[in-house]
Amino acid sequence: GLLGSIGNAIGAFIANKLKPK
C-alpha cells in the first residue's frame, strides 16, 4: 500500500545515511 511504499522509502533513506556507499 501507500504507507508501505513510504515506509520502505524512508527506511532506504535512513539506511543510506547510516551506511553510505
From Swiss-Prot:
Task: Report the subcellular localization.
Answer: Secreted
Q: Name one GO biological process term.
A: negative regulation of nitric-oxide synthase activity
Keywords (A to Z) from UniProt: Amphibian defense peptide, Secreted
Any Gene Ontology CC annotation = extracellular region
Q: What is its main location?
A: secreted
Q: Does Secreted show up as a keyword for this record? A: yes
User: Which tissues and organs express this gene's product?
Assistant: Expressed by the skin dorsal glands.
List all disulphide bridges recorded for this chain: none
Q: Name one GO molecular function term.
A: nitric-oxide synthase regulator activity
What biological function has been recorded for the protein in this entry?
Has no antimicrobial activity. Strongly inhibits the formation of NO by neuronal nitric oxide synthase at micromolar concentrations.
Q: What protein is this chain from?
A: Dahlein-5.2
